[in-house]
From Swiss-Prot:
Region (Insert): 173-241
Species in which this protein is naturally found: Ralstonia nicotianae (strain ATCC BAA-1114 / GMI1000)
Stretch list, region Disordered: 280-305
UniProt xrefs under NCBIfam families: PRK12283.1, trpS
Enzyme class: ligase
Coiled-coil regions listed in the entry: none
GO BP of this protein: tryptophanyl-tRNA aminoacylation
UniProt GO MF annotations: ATP binding; tryptophan-tRNA ligase activity
Protein's name according to its UniProt entry: Tryptophan--tRNA ligase
C-alpha cells in the first residue's frame, strides 16, 4: 500500500561509542541499501529525560550526525533529519493523544524500568509518560513499514500498531464506503477486479491468509490507483474502513554484544566506552589499562582468557589465529597482558580509520552537514504533510 519505508532514530544525549556502531549504525548501513530509510535525530525524545540540561542535546546533535556519516550512513541512500524541524511529528502526537487510553502508556514495560534506573531525575512528567506515543507518531507520520528494534523495544512497536488500529477504526469510516470501494475495484480492470473480489472473499469468509497477501500484492502492483482508492481497497480487504495509518512491522535486530572496557556491555552509564572517533592516544591508554584475569599478578603467572575482559574484545577484533595465540599464550604465561592487548588496540584503530576519514570533511566544512540535514528535513516534510492532510481530513479538521 505504501513504500516499505524503514524508520529509526537516536537521542542526542552524548558522544556515540563503538557500542552504538556495532549495535545500531552497522545495521542502518545495511538497511539503507535495501529500503527507503528515514533516520532522525530524536531531540524531542532527549528532552523527556534531559529537560533540565538542554545544552547536552544542543552539543550532541551535530556531533552525532557526523558519527552517523562516519559510520557509513549515506545521505544519497537514506533521508537524515532532525525531529524538531518537522513539526508534523508534534501535531500527530497531539491528535493521537486524544484517543489513546492512558493505560496503554502506563503498561509499556520500559516506562517503569526507566523511572527505576534514572532515580536521580524527576521523570514524573507528562512528556516522559507520553514518549511511547511520540514514538508512535514518529513512525506513523511516515507510514513506515518496518522499525528496526531490539527485543526491549518490541512493546513500543506493538503499542504503535494498537494506536494505528484504533485510529483507523475510529476515523477510517466514511459514508458509502463499500460502494466507493467497489467503484475503486472496477478501476483495476475487469480481470483484476474479479480476482481482487475473489481473494477478498477467500480471506474474509474462509480465513485464507495467502489470499490476503495475494490481494495486497495485486494492489501494490496497480500503479494507476489514486491514494484514496488504494486506501479504500486495502481497508476493504479486512473490513469496512480505510487504512489511513498502516501498522508497522518489527525488524528485530540482534542485541549489541560489544563489550566495554570492564567486560560489561559497553554503555555510557558504566563509564566503560571507547568513542567512535576517540583519538589514538586515548584508545591506547584505555585498552592498556583494562583489568585482566586477577590470577595474572606477575608476568609468569598463567591466566584464563574467559575471566579477562580483553578476551571479549579479541572476539570482536581478532582473527582465529590471533585468538588461538591469545588462548595458548595466556594459559601458559607465554605472553604478557600488554602483548595480549596490542592486537585489540590495532583492531580498534583499524576500524576507526575509515570513520575518521569520512568525518573529516564535515568537520572541516560544517556547511556540508547543514545542507544534508536541510535537504533531509525538506524530504521528510513532504511526506509528513501528505500524511497529516489525510489525518486532518479523516478527523474532520479541514474546515472551510
Amino acid at each position: 500500500m505504501f513504500p516499505e519505508r524503514v524508520l529509526s532514530g537516536m537521542r542526542p544525549t552524548g558522544a556515540l561509542h563503538l557500542g552504538h556502531y556495532h549495535g545500531v549504525l552497522k545495521n542502518w548501513v545495511r538497511l539503507q541499501a535495501e529500503y527507503p530509510c528515514f533516520f532522525f535525530v530524536a531531540d524531542w525524545h532527549a528532552l523527556t529525560t534531559h529537560y533540565e540540561s538542554p545544552e547536552v542535546i544542543e552539543e550532541s546533535v551535530w556531533e552525532m550526525l557526523i558519527d552517523w556519516l562516519a559510520a557509513g550512513v549515506d545521505p544519497t541512500q537514506a533521508t537524515l533529519f532532525i525531529q524538531s524541524r518537522v513539526p508534523e511529528h508534534a501535531e500527530l502526537f497531539l491528535l493521537l493523544s486524544m484517543g489513546t487510553p492512558l493505560g496503554w502508556l502506563e503498561r509499556v514495560p520500559t516506562y517503569k524500568d526507566q523511572i527505576e534506573k534514572l532515580k536521580e531525575k524527576d521523570l514524573s512528567t507528562y512528556g516522559f509518560l507520553g514518549y511511547p506515543l511520540l514514538q508512535a507518531a514518529d513512525i506513523l507520520i511516515y507510514r513506515a513499514g518496518f522499525v528496526p528494534v531490539g527485543e526491549d523495544q518490541v512493546p513500543h512497536v506493538e503499542m504503535t500498531r494498537e494506536v494505528a488500529r484504533r485510529f483507523n477504526y475510529l476515523y477510517g469510516r466514511e459514508p458509502g464506503f463499500e460502494q466507493k470501494a467497489l467503484d475503486a475495484a472496477k478501476k483495476l480492470g475487469g480481470k483484476r477486479a474479479k480476482l481482487y473480489l475473489e481473494l477478498r472473499t477467500a480471506h474474509q469468509e474462509r480465513g485464507e491468509d495467502d489470499a490476503l497477501e495475494q490481494a495486497r500484492a495485486l494492489l501494490a502492483e496497480s500503479q494507476s490507483l489514486s491514494m484514496g482508492d488504494r486506501e479504500r481497497l486495502f481497508g476493504y480487504l479486512e473490513g469496512a474502513r480505510k487504512i489511513i495509518l498502516p501498522e508497522p512491522q518489527v525488524l528485530l535486530t540482534e542485541a549489541s554484544r560489544m563489550p566495554g572496557l570492564d567486560g560489561q556491555k559497553m554503555s555510557k552509564s558504566y563509564g566503560n566506552t571507547i568513542r567512535m572517533r576517540e583519538d589514538k592516544a586515548s584508545v591506547e591508554k584505555k585498552v592498556r589499562t583494562m583489568p585482566t584475569d586477577p590470577a595474572r599478578v606477575r608476568r609468569t603467572d598463567p591466566g584464563d582468557p574467559g575471566k579477562c575482559p580483553v578476551w571479549q574484545l579479541h572476539q570482536v577484533y581478532s582473527d582465529a589465529d590471533t585468538r588461538e595465540w591469545v588462548q595458548k599464550g595466556c594459559r601458559s604465561a607465554g605472553i604478557g597482558c600488554l602483548e595480549c592487548k596490542q592486537p585489540v588496540i590495532d583492531g580498534i584503530l583499524r576500524e576507526q580509520q575509515p570513520m575518521l576519514e569520512r568525518a573529516q570533511k564535515y568537520m572541516d566544512d560544517p556547511s556540508l552537514l547543514r545542507a544534508i540535514i536541510a535537504d533531509g528535513c525538506d524530504t521528510a516534510h513532504k511526506v509528513t504533510q501528505e500524511t497529516m492532510r489525510e489525518v486532518r481530513e479523516a478527523m474532520g479538521l479541514t474546515y472551510s
